[in-house]
């Protein structure tokens, strides 16, 4: 399973969420809450923020239309 960050609209508010895909590239699920970046060092934080910025180039998803990731 692969994943990336995607912007989601939830009640008129935009946030970045991790989104998970199945082997065919279809959306399989999302995290329950938006992602808040943390890192052990500046380079790690930079990499995470760059991945989050990539989400701004993708279509905005509606939060309600993407199922929560199951355990």
Task: Name these PLM-found stretches.
Residues 1-24:
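Short N-terminal "domain-start" leader segments
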Residues 15, 19-22, 28-36, 42, ...:
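Buried hydrophobic residues that stabilize the cores of well-folded domains
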Residues 2-3, 35-37, 42-71:
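Low-complexity intrinsically disordered segments
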């Amino acid at each position: 399973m692969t994943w990336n960050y995607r912007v989601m609209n939830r009640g008129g508010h935009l946030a970045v969420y991790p989104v998970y895909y199945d082997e065919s590239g279809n959306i399989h699920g999302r995290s329950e809450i938006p992602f808040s970046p943390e890192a052990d060092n500046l380079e790690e934080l930079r990499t995470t923020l760059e991945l989050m910025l990539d989400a701004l180039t993708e279509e905005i998803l509606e939060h309600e239309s993407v199922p929560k990731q199951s355990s």
